[in-house]
Amino acid sequence: MVQKYESPVRIYKYPFELVMAAYERRFPTCPQMPIVLDCEIIDDAETDNGAKRETKRRCKLAVDAPYLFKKIIGIDVAYFIQTNFLDLKTRTLNIEAINETFSSRIEIFEKCRYYAHPENPDWTCFDQVATLDIKNFFGFEHSMEKMGMKQYSQTTQKGKEIIEYFINELKKEGISHVDRWKEDETTEPAATATTTVSISSEKPPLTRDNSILDADYIATYLGQLSPLQESKLVQFRKKIEETNHEGKVPDYQTLLRFLRARDFSIEKAASMLQESLQWREEHRIDDILGEYKTPVVVEKYFPGGWHHHDKDGRPLYILRLGNMDVKGLLKSVGEDELLKLTLHICEEGLKLMKEATKLFGKPIWNWCLLVDLDGLSMRHLWRPGVKALLRIIETVEKNYPETMGRVLIVRAPRVFPVLWTIVSAFIDENTRSKFLFFGGPDCLHIEDGLEHYIPTEKIPSFLGGSCITMIHEGGLIPKHLYKSESVEEHNGVPHGHEHHGLYKSVDLKPGQMFELVIKNTDPKSVLTWDIDVLKNDILFALYRTDKDLEQSFNDSFSSVFDNADMKEGVHYTRLEEKVRCKPKEGVQGSHEMATAGTYVLQWMCPPSCDGPAQLMYFHEILSSANYKGSMTSLQSGFSSNSLQSR
């Protein structure tokens, strides 16, 4: 397989002629490049009245490889042929180099170019491309590829430093300017004075059209990259340009994020990015910042918002998840609207990262998320809510990779391991490594507390800091804000709601009951339930017995405990007192099944009701292996998240 290296544009803030004088000082050897043992000129010719010069050198390089490897291949040095094409009239130097040693087994080709900056004639640009094709190398092809590209990237990294070094040496000798070439005495001389140009208030050179990558841009907007990473980024850009003929090509920050997400595999990153670009076009994501209208319910009850920056300059988003009425939000705005809200936040994050880069004068290419879990309970594990969360996570992971720099989880209660077990499997491993957890109520006055990550004066007051936030506290959403839809219109079954197939519907006549028998063989597992009452009152209770009971489908006016040999307190125990659930009311709860046995969920329509009752229920058992007994028991919880209709 051919390995390719392609550099970004390097810029020397010196005229081309001075850079050429420094370049010549490299030969035949220089201490900054010890791998080059000698360079012998084998041909040197000038043409066009001295404007053009072609120089051919035979370069002797030390083989930087393990001793045993050098013994196997039988050489300590390698020879390369380098040909330079200098054109002083056009102010360009083109360099080509090929290997002479092992040329039948290995093909190494390098092409470099020095040229006058197209926008500032007193600056000089440099770029290079190299390929390595190992055909047959004693069975060491893969090792040779890795070693060759590693060594090549190390030497190219020194190239700019060497030119800068020799320019400084020239200055010490009193040479700070070299005249431009001129054709004859009658030709008007070109300007020779060195011009100092400030670009502090401009965009980086050569990037105004967002197509050419230069070193200054990398330092300002992308951060430190290895030569191979820079090369991958340049190649990735070209690949996207070739495959995305009609659409615009994303900026380098976006390209780099997708490359990082796929461990700098160009093919994998390209596939991921193309799918994301298609998704953005289909859902008009580029217009979301200008077109999105925040629903009234979100404005009043969504407990999240942007809040200054963390200590590294990242935009900080705070989400008070423990105060979020997940069920209420889903019923009032729907899953699609919650996803759209999340995408709007992500797009805001991209914009704020660019603003932070300019504000702090350094690359900011991700943001920080602080999640306050105070108030988190089993009601947050409502399965449709978790399902919506997983959909949101999946969408964000696919389309906004590497935007999360750090996630601070504060005031995590004992129930949090349950949610984390469910959710973490859907989060990229690299993203999971950025999570920091603070379990106690005080996340400030502890070792490695929040003050290590957020400026003291910006820590929110609800976490013990002094900064007042504009973030809503959340709370339960009134049921009159839920989307209206008549249950009766659809024969009592919620029509087309997003949880169809997950919940089961039960109709009960006055005095009738429904019992769900659960045989538990997993001590310390957790039984969770969610109930929505559609019509009339319902009585709910939870029981446990050691007896092996079977699900009854016959006389629904009697209980499985009505046998003569079953006595409450002796043969079975009531774990949850009877709770009266009102119409359009939701009940969520859970119980740790500490021991094996039979558990019975019971719903009953009181005999005093003047008509039949209807409910929908869902239950789930969370394995003890995942839950790990982090809580002794959780009580049923009421919410006004009533089922006005689904």
From Swiss-Prot:
Domain GOLD: 499-646
Boundaries of every CRAL-TRIO domain copy: 294-471
Residues covered by the PRELI/MSF1 domain: 2-175
Intrachain disulfide bonds: none
Subcellular location: Mitochondrion
InterPro entries, per database record: CRAL-TRIO_dom, CRAL-TRIO_dom_sf, CRAL/TRIO_N_dom, CRAL/TRIO_N_dom_sf, GOLD_dom_sf, PRELI/MSF1_dom, SEC14/CRAL-TRIO_domain
Mitochondrion keyword on record: yes
Entry's Gene Ontology cellular component terms: mitochondrion
Protein name: Protein real-time
Organism: Aedes aegypti
Lineage summary: Eukaryota, Metazoa, Ecdysozoa, Arthropoda, Hexapoda
